[in-house]
C-alpha cells in the first residue's frame, strides 16, 4: 500500500479504497478501526495512511529527518521543547494509554496538564508528533469524528525488522 497522503480524511479513505481490489468504504473504515491501516505523520507533518505492517520500517527510514526538521521549525516559533520534557511526556503516554486504551488529543492534554506538563494546543502538537515519530503512539480507534491515539506496541503486532536496503527496495 505504501503511504497515502491527503489533507482531507474522507478523501484519503477513498484513495485507499480505489487502490485495493474489492474495497468498500466499510472495509477501509474497518481496517482503520482495527488498526490494520494507521493514520500517521510518517513522512512529514501531513496525514498519511499506511498499512500497520509497514509503520515500523517507514519510521526507521524517516523519523530522524522529520524530528530534525520539526525541531528546527519549532525553534523559530519559540516552541523548542527540551528532550527531558519529551521523555517525561512519553513516559506519561505509556502510562495513560497502557491496556489498549485509545484517548483523544484533548484527553491526553488533560492528563499532561494534571501532571505538570503545560499542554496547550501548539505544544500538544509537538508532543504527539514526536511520540509518533519515535514509535510510541499511533492512531487509535476513531470515536465518531474524533481521532484517538494508542500505543503502537499494543496496536500493531511485532513484524520482522527490515534492513535499510530492504526498506528502500
Where are these regions (language model features)?
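Long, low-complexity intrinsically disordered regions
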Residues: 1-169
Amino acid at each position: 500500500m505504501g503511504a497515502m497522503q491527503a489533507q482531507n480524511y474522507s478523501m484519503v479513505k477513498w484513495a485507499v479504497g480505489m487502490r485495493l481490489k474489492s474495497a468498500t468504504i466499510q472495509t477501509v473504515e474497518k481496517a482503520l478501526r482495527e488498526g490494520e491501516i494507521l493514520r500517521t505523520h510518517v513522512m512529514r507533518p501531513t496525514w498519511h495512511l499506511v498499512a500497520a505492517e509497514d509503520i515500523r520500517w517507514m519510521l526507521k527510514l524517516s523519523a530522524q529527518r522529520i524530528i530534525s526538521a520539526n525541531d528546527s521549525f519549532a525553534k523559530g516559533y519559540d516552541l523548542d521543547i527540551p528532550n527531558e520534557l519529551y521523555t517525561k511526556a512519553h513516559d506519561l503516554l505509556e502510562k495513560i494509554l497502557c491496556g489498549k486504551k485509545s484517548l483523544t488529543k484533548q484527553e491526553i492534554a488533560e492528563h499532561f496538564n494534571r501532571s505538570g506538563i503545560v499542554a496547550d494546543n501548539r505544544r500538544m502538537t509537538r508532543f504527539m508528533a514526536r511520540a509518533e515519530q519515535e514509535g510510541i503512539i499511533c492512531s487509535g480507534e476513531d470515536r465518531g469524528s474524533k481521532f484517538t491515539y494508542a500505543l503502537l506496541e499494543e496496536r500493531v503486532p511485532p513484524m520482522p525488522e527490515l534492513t535499510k536496503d530492504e526498506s528502500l527496495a
